[in-house]
């Protein structure tokens, strides 16, 4: 039976996201576990168009965009030392972390 831990990281700032992935990868490599990644996933770009004036001048508009960057890390056949190392990693406040445990047969 082969287990995997999938870690998805999301952030609006790619620099803090890259720093978080480096910290996780170094923590996992210290436990001598097999790690694949960081795999860059497609970024989501949200664009918003708003009127500059609340009353008239419909043609005068302003556009904003927000980019959500994502990375994927896959840890193959983890041991308890990996889970302990992952729980001790301190990440930046702007990074969202989703951890999935996948058990294969």
UniProtKB/Swiss-Prot annotation:
It comes from the Bacteria. GO terms for cellular component: ribonucleoprotein complex; ribosome. The keyword Metal-binding does not apply. One of its GO terms (molecular function) is tRNA binding. Keywords: Ribonucleoprotein, Ribosomal protein. GO terms for biological process: translation. Belongs to the universal ribosomal protein uS10 family. NCBIfam families: PRK00596.1, rpsJ_bact. Involved in the binding of tRNA to the ribosomes. Part of the 30S ribosomal subunit. HAMAP family: Ribosomal_uS10. This is Small ribosomal subunit protein uS10.
């Amino acid at each position: 039976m082969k287990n995997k831990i999938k870690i998805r990281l999301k952030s609006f700032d790619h620099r803090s996201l890259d720093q978080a992935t480096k910290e996780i990868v170094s923590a996992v490599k210290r436990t001598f576990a097999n790690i694949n990644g960081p795999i860059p996933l497609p970024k989501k770009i949200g664009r918003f168009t708003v009127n500059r004036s609340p009353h008239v001048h419909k043609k005068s508009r302003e556009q904003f965009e927000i980019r959500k960057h994502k990375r994927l890390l896959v840890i193959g056949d983890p041991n308890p030392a990996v889970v302990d190392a992952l729980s001790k990693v301190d990440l930046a406040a702007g990074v969202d972390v989703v951890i999935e445990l996948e058990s294969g047969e």
